[in-house]
Amino acid sequence: QFPIHKASPKAGGDYPFQFVSCHARWSIHSTWRDTPMMLRLQRGEPQVWINQIDATKIGVKDFEYAEIYNNYGSIRMRIKVSTMVRPGVAYYYHAWEPHQFPNHESYKWLIPGIVNPILMAGGYGQINHAMNRYQPGSAVQDTRVGIKPWHGQETKTYPVEKNPDATNI
């Protein structure tokens, strides 16, 4: 019997865009990600790259804000329109810190993660639960998202209930 290809499940829901990430180009992991010199190399804030065809369909232009969302949550990022991105792909560089997003959001809110039971133990310094602890640094390549224009209305959602006692949000 020959092996057959089976499509991967669409993590995050049945949305039109594949959320793809790669290593940050202008930092060493998240180190120096928010220094003025490095920010000048990359428009100064988180951005998601999409194809011109997709941008036209959605109704967004280069450098406008858009809402990126799926079943896990929603965030806002600036759009970077590029012909280098394949249609149907939303591409971003990882390692942006939540304080660099509007309203302290994070791209990690859209990424499924596996719960590590050790993180459920509390009160031990480095072992504590806070937002974004369950998600990996980069998107699983099967993560799906939708994108729509954002014109200033509030879209803030939390993927899990906000913990007022968490210190690392």
Feature roles, as predicted:
Residues 1-36:
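Long, low-complexity segments enriched in small/aliphatic residues
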